[in-house]
A protein has these predicted regions:
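Class I S-adenosyl-L-methionine-dependent methyltransferase catalytic core
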Residues: 1-198
């Protein structure tokens, strides 16, 4: 197995493959509670563990709200949590591209509430020492820096009493052009994947 580094160049599927190869043992129970179209798992061999998928919109056989999961308390080894954080109220193109049916018209603080609710429920279903994987991205909202990576850490550690297992920084191999020519802050092209231990 090659070394795993915190900084990763590529896409979500590349990162998830590397992290799951390192952290997910054969036969473990993995619940992706924001499955979407399954983009995370396209490059991962999921036959060596039990992958349970659900989504509030895209999984007809498993339409579950991540705030009210169907799993027993303490029954899952890994919960994968990637809620629609790419939002821009009033910009339908952004909301449609990122599947934001549940966050349409929401702002950063509203989405943080969803994170907190989903992470609390994920903690419930995790086994002792189970891992919660949380995807997030910093953003600028109304000309203010919103450091989601810090806010998500505080929810997990201060409120839910979890501990940090790892943090990955994903830098895409290609960056789409921006529409706005005038720049006030550095562009945020990277995202994060937190791993918190129950």
């Amino acid at each position: 197995m090659s070394s795993l580094y915190t900084a990763h160049l590529g896409n979500n599927a590349d990162l998830i493959r590397a992290v799951s190869d390192f952290y997910v043992a054969s036969g473990q129970q993995v619940a992706d509670v924001t499955y979407g179209k399954g983009a995370f798992w396209r490059k991962t061999d999921t036959t060596r563990f039990s992958l349970h998928v659900s989504d509030i919109v895209t999984c007809p056989d498993a339409l579950h709200d991540f705030r009210d999961l169907p799993y027993k308390t303490g029954s899952i080894d890994h919960v994968i949590f990637d809620p629609p954080y790419m939002h821009n109220a009033g910009r339908p193109m952004v909301e449609e591209r990122y599947g934001n049916a549940t966050t349409k018209g929401m702002y950063h603080d509203d989405i943080l509430v969803l994170y907190a609710q989903g992470m609390k429920e994920a903690r419930r279903v995790l086994r002792r020492d189970g891992l919660l994987w949380v995807k997030c991205k910093d953003e600028i909202e109304s000309s203010r820096q919103r450091m989601s990576v810090v806010e998500i850490h505080d929810i997990a550690v201060r409120i839910l009493q979890m501990t940090v297992k790892d943090l990955f920084i994903l830098v895409p191999s290609s960056i789409p052009p921006v529409q706005h020519k005038k720049q006030y802050h550095a562009r945020k092209s990277h995202s994060y994947l937190w791993l918190f231990k129950k």
